Amino acid sequence: MAGILFEDIFDVKDIDPEGKKFDRVSRLHCESESFKMDLILDVNIQIYPVDLGDKFRLVIASTLYEDGTLDDGEYNPTDDRPSRADQFEYVMYGKVYRIEGDETSTEAATRLSAYVSYGGLLMRLQGDANNLHGFEVDSRVYLLMKKLAF
């Protein structure tokens, strides 16, 4: 689908392992089912409570429009086009601020880590470089989440 940079199902393996730092935010440590990616994600648990063992679908996209049309980064309440956000429970908009690899001087990176800030809520998605090829520093991305019943 146009505009989707990454999509997978994640299992919540740990919550706030270093201790709770903020009242309304928890840091989730998750692992994906298909691509074995590691995810660390800050979530506003007052809006979207998450429990240990929960499974959720995560999509990282460059646009909310199904046809891949880029938006201008501003909310337009009169826009009535269908949106990817309609199918999800929790959506954030942020900026990729760092990409790190395990490259050496002789080999290209096989594992990458993409870091995104969603207004101060942070995400690190780490895994095979092939799964993170669409991420670019300073690009704007949407994170979309929906819990799965299992």
Swiss-Prot record:
Assigned keywords, A-Z: Acetylation, DNA-binding, DNA-directed RNA polymerase, Nucleus, Transcription
PTM-bearing positions, type N-acetylalanine: 2
Taxonomy, superkingdom: Eukaryota
Localization annotation: Nucleus; Nucleus, Nucleolus
UniProt key word Transcription: yes
Single GO BP term: transcription by RNA polymerase II
Gene Ontology CC entries for this record: cytosol; nucleoplasm; nucleus; protein-DNA complex; RNA polymerase I complex; RNA polymerase II, core complex; RNA polymerase III complex
Region Non-specific ssDNA binding: start-end pairs: 16-40
Stored Pfam families: RNA_pol_Rpb8 (PF03870)
GO molecular function terms attached to this record: DNA-directed RNA polymerase activity; single-stranded DNA binding
Record keyword Transcription present: yes
SUPFAM superfamilies linked: Nucleic acid-binding proteins
Family designation: Belongs to the eukaryotic RPB8 RNA polymerase subunit family.
PANTHER family: DNA-DIRECTED RNA POLYMERASES I, II, AND III SUBUNIT RPABC3 (PTHR10917:SF0)
Subunit field text: Component of the RNA polymerase I (Pol I), RNA polymerase II (Pol II) and RNA polymerase III (Pol III) complexes consisting of at least 13, 12 and 17 subunits, respectively. Pol I complex consists of a ten-subunit catalytic core composed of POLR1A/RPA1, POLR1B/RPA2, POLR1C/RPAC1, POLR1D/RPAC2, POLR1H/RPA12, POLR2E/RPABC1, POLR2F/RPABC2, POLR2H/RPABC3, POLR2K/RPABC4 and POLR2L/RPABC5; a mobile stalk subunit POLR1F/RPA43 protruding from the core and additional subunits homologous to general transcription factors POLR1E/RPA49 and POLR1G/RPA34.
Record's function text: DNA-dependent RNA polymerase catalyzes the transcription of DNA into RNA using the four ribonucleoside triphosphates as substrates. Common component of RNA polymerases I, II and III which synthesize ribosomal RNA precursors, mRNA precursors and many functional non-coding RNAs, and small RNAs, such as 5S rRNA and tRNAs, respectively.
Stated name of the protein: DNA-directed RNA polymerases I, II, and III subunit RPABC3
Record organism: Homo sapiens
